[in-house]
């Protein structure tokens, strides 16, 4: 047996065999190992899985084929779908060829001169390619028309030299204003030393001119602007007290002049009220007029009317009364409060109980009649179905 294994190994190593496939996976994978004990050509993956199964398989002596290099791993049999794709870089590449070409193309174009720069420079100058790349990729360009080197005085205007005098004695424009108006690039800029009060006065003068143009204000109107330190309004208590005192004095003067007239009017009003309170009827004349028709009162006695208290007449509120008039008999019904004697109330209660009793009795009779009719002709679906009839 040992001789047979050695002979197989010698035959395999001695012959220059062509590339052979794996006997285990039966694929086009190139065999890397030959096992004389199993007499099989195996690839790298199949050799590892077969000879690591148990201790006996691990003892097998295997021969590496010459066709495979010692550092060769398992070859790819099929191409994967993501083969050829590369992961995109997280950060932009520096010194790209496309960017250098773009810089070469743009270098021929004229550039805008830097504001506040030296005249010798003339144009913008790029310090280095790396610096411009960083500014283009990561930063937003900021336009800064002013330079720290040119600002000599904080209170002065930016591009005006110190020799120029800003003040003028007459109303003509100074040198600073002329320089500002002549320079097209700085049209509309305000000198930094201009006070806020001067600016507000200029705005107010412009507003007055607009009001004159629009017709809101006449040219002859001359007004004085009062400067207020605080915004809002204040109530002067002294002025209010003075106004109140004036009103009180006017009222006192009116009372002194027309006091007699007001007192006469009040006295006449009091007399009218007293006469209206002490108004009385001639009950004798009323009774004589109603003598043929009977007494208008239920009890036949004149009640005592108290005008200061409740004016409701309890003698007329409840019950039924027949009052005779010239047209005929008039029936006065009972009041809202349902008042009356105890006998009338008991009679009403008895009538209600009797009505309720008869209603329940009629309902019970109707129920019994329906039940009898249902028993005479039984139905499959219904309440009154006799069980005996269904069983028979």
UniProtKB/Swiss-Prot annotation:
Q: Where is the signal peptide?
A: none
Coiled coil (UniProt feature): 226-254
Binding positions (Zn(2+))? 22, 25, 46, 51
CCT domain mapped to chain residues: 345-387
Q: Which InterPro entries match?
A: CCT_domain, CONSTANS-like_Bbox1, CONSTANS-like_ZF, Znf_B-box
**Which GO terms label this protein's molecular function in UniProt?**
DNA-binding transcription factor activity; transcription cis-regulatory region binding; zinc ion binding
Q: Where is the composition biased (Basic and acidic residues)?
A: 259-271
> Could you tell me which residues belong to the region Disordered?
246-271, 326-346
Question: Per its record, how is this protein called by name?
Answer: Zinc finger protein CONSTANS-LIKE 7
């Amino acid at each position: 047996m040992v001789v047979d294994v050695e002979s197989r190994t010698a035959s395999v190593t001695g012959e220059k065999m062509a590339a052979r496939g794996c006997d285990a996976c039966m694929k086009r994978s190139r065999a890397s190992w030959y096992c004389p004990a199993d007499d099989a050509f195996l690839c790298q993956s199949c050799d590892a899985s077969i000879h690591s199964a148990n201790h006996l398989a691990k003892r097998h002596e295997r021969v590496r084929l010459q066709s495979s290099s010692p550092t060769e791993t398992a070859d790819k049999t099929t191409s994967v779908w993501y083969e050829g794709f590369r992961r995109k870089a997280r950060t932009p590449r520096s010194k790209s060829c496309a960017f250098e070409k773009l810089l070469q193309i743009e270098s021929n174009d004229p550039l805008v001169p830097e504001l506040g720069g030296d005249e010798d420079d003339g144009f913008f100058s790029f310090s280095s390619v790396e610096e411009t790349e960083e500014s283009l990729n990561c930063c937003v360009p900021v336009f800064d028309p002013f330079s720290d080197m040119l600002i000599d005085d904080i209170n002065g205007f930016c591009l005006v030299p110190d020799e120029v005098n800003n003040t003028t004695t007459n109303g003509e424009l100074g040198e600073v204003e002329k320089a500002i108006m002549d320079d097209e690039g700085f049209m509309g800029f305000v000198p930094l030393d201009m006070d806020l009060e001067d600016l507000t006065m200029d705005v107010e003068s412009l507003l007055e001119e607009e009001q004159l143009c629009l017709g809101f204000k006449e040219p002859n109107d001359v007004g004085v602007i009062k400067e207020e330190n605080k915004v809002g309004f204040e109530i002067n208590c002294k002025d209010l007290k003075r106004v109140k005192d004036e009103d009180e004095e006017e009222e006192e003067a009116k009372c002194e002049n027309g006091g007699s007239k007001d007192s006469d009017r009040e006295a006449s009003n009091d007399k009218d009220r007293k006469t209206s309170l002490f108004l009385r009827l001639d009950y004798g004349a009323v009774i004589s007029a109603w003598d043929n028709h009977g007494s208008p009162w239920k009890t036949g006695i004149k009640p005592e009317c108290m005008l200061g208290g409740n004016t409701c007449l309890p003698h007329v509120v409840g019950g039924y009364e027949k009052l005779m008039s010239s047209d005929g008999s008039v029936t006065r019904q009972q009041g809202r409060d349902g008042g009356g004697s105890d006998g009338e109330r008991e009679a009403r209660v008895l009538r209600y109980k009797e009505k309720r009793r008869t209603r329940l009795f009629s309902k019970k009779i109707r129920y019994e009649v329906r039940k009898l009719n249902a028993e005479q002709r039984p139905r499959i679906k219904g309440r009154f179905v006799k069980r005996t009839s269904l069983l028979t």
